[in-house]
Amino acid sequence: MLVLLCVDGQTDLSFLDRLQQCGGLQGVTNLTVVPRFTPDVADAVRQKARAYWPDAMPDDAPGRIILLDPRTLPRRHGLHLLLDALCRQTGAVLAFGDDMAIDRHGQVSDPWFKPGFDPLLAARGMLPGPMTALGLDRLRNPLAVWASLRGDNTEPDDPLMTVLAAVSRDEVLHCPHVVAFRFERAVRPRRQIAPPVPDPLPTVSIIIPTRDGWDLLGPCLDSLGRTDWPVAQREIIVVDNGSSDPACLAGLARAEAAGSVRVLRDPRPFNFAALNNRAASLARGELLVFLNNDTLALRPDWLGVLSAFAWLPGAGAVGPKLLYADGSVQHAGLVFGLNGRAVHVHVGLPSDGGGYQGLATTSHEVSGVTGACLALRRAAFEAVGGFNEGFPVAYNDMVLCADLMKKGYRNLYVAEPLFLHLESRTRGNLDNPEKHRREADEAARARALHPDLFAADPHYSPNLSLDAPYVPAVPPRRRPPWDLAGNPSPPAD
């Protein structure tokens, strides 16, 4: 087994002694140190490790290698877990696992139980992690990766990013076990760079169902009127589902006469999915934005932010961070399977609160976003047939997101607080037995449509509980290899 230790000018050379003492390199036959940026230090570490790094990729280069950050200790079984996962998965090029912090007394804390691979998290340095296994013989251009590992480029680069740029997401495998300990308590992410706004700008249709409630809809429309998107390339469609309140009827008439909205009258019994589907079929936008009437836009550039993420390759539903009126988090993505339902996570955090490993303040892939503010390209919406009208009140947004994932789209949470959401003020909360029964029924039918997603949300680690979000599962929901082999416990660390 070959382990590549990536070092820089700040590396403590005693690190190699710690590796050997902890047994983390048990079974390693070749420890090679990658010289990074500082030749003197690289030479010293080379000598201490009694290893070398060839200038050119040799013909007998190993097929499997481990990339190891010097601030990391492998668990005794960690290297083997990664290599085993890489070898078992046909087509996998890179495997990564979970990690925990460790202090100088050997106490562990701060587990980072990771989701499946996510390019947005990888671009921020939160994935893959400090120890990864690489199938060098499976790369289409191994020479470029070899050069990056040696630090041949004029500008220092991250060899992992070079690898990730050369592979597809299906070739990156997550091994959901703690494989390494890190000497830093928390992940220190790079600054997240927002994607560019589409050029040319797409036409946008904003669709808002309502029945009465002008005290909510009026301020919502006022906030949308401050949007900086060109007026000629946006439209607001209000679906009037049988309003009878004079104030609402008068307000809609004024807005329609002013040309600021189109009013689509649809007095059928309330069916959120059907109302939105009909409006979408009559809309002219390339980008569809479904919005509750109890929302308030907080920034004039909100459409630019959402459209930028919606135009990323493979993007499905896109939803921003939503805040309650008091400024705390109402929505920061959905996790499927928690207590058998699809559940909002990070609810109640301060607007700038990081939540679990900073996910609340990091745009990333999720399995679902709320229909209270949901943007997606028309092509993606039509590819799944729109909202499932068998879910008239609840779970229509979650089923839409699940349908998109099944078609290969990726749903995205945008960690920008773009709207206030006065949650369910128009329909009320689930405050009576009938509403509870209906919500439970729609949850059960959603599980029946997408059982695999509710059983194992790919964006939520199996090491995390299904009883409460982002707390460790006891025991973990994924059995480790030694358990499958009939051994009750792992090798001791």
Model-derived segments and spans:
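A recurrent flexible, glycine/aromatic-enriched loop bordering the glycosyltransferase active site
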Residues: 108-138, 273-274, 281, 337-379, ...
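Conserved donor NDP-sugar-binding/catalytic core segment of glycosyltransferases
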Residues: 77-109, 169-170, 295-341
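Short aromatic/hydrophobic "clamp" motif used to bind/position activated sugar donors
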Residues: 65, 288
